[in-house]
C-alpha cells in the first residue's frame, strides 16, 4: 500500500500554523463534562480551527512524508487511573472523554488524516454488568455530546464494529454522527465500538465463503485484496502508527488486518493523563524510524 494517500510532496508540511495567543484553549478539566470552547468562524468559511492546548504548545514540524497517514490508538488505563485515586473505575472513563477530543484536535493540528480509537472491544463484554452498562451509555452520550464540536472542525466520524449485542441506542447515535459529518474531509475518526480484529476477519471470511458457495466468486482467485474489500470499512488505509497508552505492550485484537506493517509505540501514561503533546511525541518517534516493509 502507498505510504501516504495525499498528493503532497515530501517537502510539504501539513501542520496548521500556530494559533493566535488569544485563541480558545482546551481542555479545562475543572468541570465535567469538560466544556468545549466557542470557536471563531474560519476566515474562508470552512472548518474551524481546533482550540489550542491549554499549554499553548505547537505541533512539531513534520513533512508529509514523515507523517503517519493513519494512527490507531488503544486508549488504555482508565480503570487503573481511577483505582490509583480510590475512585470507581467509571470515573476514569469519564476523565478520558476530554482526552479523546484533545487528541482529535492535536491530530488535526499535526495533519493526520485518519485516527482510529478503540472505545469498546468485543472482549469488553467480559467485564462486570455494571461497567458494561456504564460503557454502553457513556459511549452513546459521548458521541451525542461531542459530534457537533467535531463536525465544526471538519471531522468525519464513522463507527467501526459489529452489531451483535451492541445497544441500539449506541448504533443510532453513531449513525446520526456519521450522517451529519459525512461531507467532512479534514480528518476521519473511526470510533471503534464492539470491535475485534479477529471478529472483523471472521465476518469477512464468512461473506467470501457465501459468495464462493453461490458461485459468484472463484476460490482460486481470492487474494488479500478480496479480504480487504469485505472488511467492515474497506477504505480504511493500513495503520502506520499504532499507539497504546498505560505501558502495556500488546495489540489487544485491534486492527489486526490493517496493522500488518504498523510501527508500534507504547507510552506509559494512563489515558486520562494523556494529551495531544503525547500524540505528537509518538509521531516524532515514528518519523525517526526506517520502515522497510520487508525489504532489506
Curated annotation (Swiss-Prot):
Region (Disordered): 1-58
Binding site for Mg(2+): 76, 263
Reactions listed under catalytic activity: (2Z,6E)-farnesyl diphosphate + 7 isopentenyl diphosphate = (2Z,6Z,10Z,14Z,18Z,22Z,26Z,30Z,34E)-decaprenyl diphosphate + 7 diphosphate; n isopentenyl diphosphate + (2E,6E)-farnesyl diphosphate = a di-trans,poly-cis-polyprenyl diphosphate + n diphosphate
GO BP field: polyprenol biosynthetic process
Gene Ontology MF annotations: ditrans,polycis-undecaprenyl-diphosphate synthase [(2E,6E)-farnesyl-diphosphate specific] activity; magnesium ion binding; manganese ion binding; Z-farnesyl diphosphate synthase activity
EC number: 2.5.1.86, 2.5.1.87
Cofactor(s) the record lists: Mg(2+)
Pfam families: Prenyltransf (PF01255)
Binding site for substrate: 77-81, 89, 93, 121-123, 125, 127, 244, 250-252
Keyword annotations from UniProtKB, A to Z: Cell membrane, Magnesium, Membrane, Metal-binding, Transferase
GO cellular component: cytosol; plasma membrane
Cofactor descriptive note: Binds 2 magnesium ions per subunit.
Compartments, record wording: Cell membrane
Highest taxon above the source species: Bacteria
Active site per the UniProt annotation: 76, 124
Classification via NCBIfam families: PRK14827.1 (NF011402), PRK14829.1 (NF011404), uppS (TIGR00055)
Family to which the UniProt record says this protein belongs: Belongs to the UPP synthase family.
SUBUNIT field: Homodimer.
Protein name per Swiss-Prot or TrEMBL: Decaprenyl diphosphate synthase
Lineage of the organism: Bacteria, Bacillati, Actinomycetota, Actinomycetes, Mycobacteriales
Amino acid at each position: 500500500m502507498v505510504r501516504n494517500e495525499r498528493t503532497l510532496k515530501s517537502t510539504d508540511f501539513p501542520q496548521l500554523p500556530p494559533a493566535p495567543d488569544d485563541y480558545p484553549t482546551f481542555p479545562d478539566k475543572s468541570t465535567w463534562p469538560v466544556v468545549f470552547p466557542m470557536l471563531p468562524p474560519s476566515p474562508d468559511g470552512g472548518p474551524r480551527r481546533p482550540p489550542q492546548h491549554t499549554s499553548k504548545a505547537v505541533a512539531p514540524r513534520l513533512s508529509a512524508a514523515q507523517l503517519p497517514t493513519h494512527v490507531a490508538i488503544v486508549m488504555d488505563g482508565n480503570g487503573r487511573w481511577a483505582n490509583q485515586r480510590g475512585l470507581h473505575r467509571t470515573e476514569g472513563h469519564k476523565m478520558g472523554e476530554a482526552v479523546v477530543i484533545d487528541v482529535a484536535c492535536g491530530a488535526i493540528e499535526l495533519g493526520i488524516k485518519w485516527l482510529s480509537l478503540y472505545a469498546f472491544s468485543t472482549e469488553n463484554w467480559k467485564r462486570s454488568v455494571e461497567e458494561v452498562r456504564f460503557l454502553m451509555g457513556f459511549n452513546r452520550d459521548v458521541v451525542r455530546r461531542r459530534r457537533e464540536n467535531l463536525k465544526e472542525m471538519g471531522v468525519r466520524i464513522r463507527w467501526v464494529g459489529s452489531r451483535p449485542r451492541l445497544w441500539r441506542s449506541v448504533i443510532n447515535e453513531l449513525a446520526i454522527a456519521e450522517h451529519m459529518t459525512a461531507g467532512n474531509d479534514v480528518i476521519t475518526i473511526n470510533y471503534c465500538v464492539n470491535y475485534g480484529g479477529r471478529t472483523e476477519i471472521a465476518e469477512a471470511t464468512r461473506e467470501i465463503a457465501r459468495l464462493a458457495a453461490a458461485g459468484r466468486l472463484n476460490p482460486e482467485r481470492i487474494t488479500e485484496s478480496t479480504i480487504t474489500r469485505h472488511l467492515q470499512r474497506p477504505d480504511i488505509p493500513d495503520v502506520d502508527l499504532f499507539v497504546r497508552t498505560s505501558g502495556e505492550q500488546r495489540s489487544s485484537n485491534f486492527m489486526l488486518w490493517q496493522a500488518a506493517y504498523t510501527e508500534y509505540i507504547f507510552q506509559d501514561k494512563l489515558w486520562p493523563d494523556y494529551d495531544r503533546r503525547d500524540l505528537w511525541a509518538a509521531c516524532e518517534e515514528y518519523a525517526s524510524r526506517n520502515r522497510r516493509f520487508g525489504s532489506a
